[in-house]
């Protein structure tokens, strides 16, 4: 087994980091083979305490994906690669309960289709953000803490607010953005070859 030291915190000892890395692999195996067997994963995944994956959802997780504490994944989601998700982030359905049917209580309402949420490569989602189902979060996106994302986000944009809106582009120029997207593609191409 090759341990990836790129993500090692400053000041951490290599031995301690290696032990924690291996323990995480064991914990991930337990989570996705015994506790949440409906979740499919492909690569290194770090799941902090009290994060939950709702039963019956179609959830797939790529390589180098980290979930902070108390995250709640309660909709169909495809997580690609190299994703950081801070604590208390929620992925929720868009149409969990129909509320616009005259003469029917919300409690008794039928459930609508929520769609599949796609989180592309190299995404960072801030603390307590809420992601509504059926959207695509593009490559290289940063989502601010507390944001409520209700629509698709294009590659390399920074979004925040309630509801979330574009704050700015992640990179100053289009050529920097294109260079970064080529870099992401090159990483994925190399991963497929290995």
Can you say where each PLM-predicted feature lies in the sequence?
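Terminal amphipathic alpha-helical/low-complexity segments used for targeting or macromolecular assembly
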Residues: 1-37, 43-44, 82, 97-102, ...
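Hydrophobic, membrane-inserted alpha-helices
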Residues: 45, 65-67, 143
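Flexible, glycine/small-residue-enriched loop-and-beta-strand segment within the central core
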Residues: 51-61, 66-135, 162, 170-171
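Conserved acidic donor-binding loop of glycosyltransferase catalytic domains
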Residues: 92-93, 144, 150-151, 167-169
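Beta-rich strand-turn-strand
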Residues: 127-142, 147-151
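Glycine-centered loop/turn positions within well-structured domains
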Residues: 147, 155-157, 165
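Short arginine-rich
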Residues: 152-156, 186
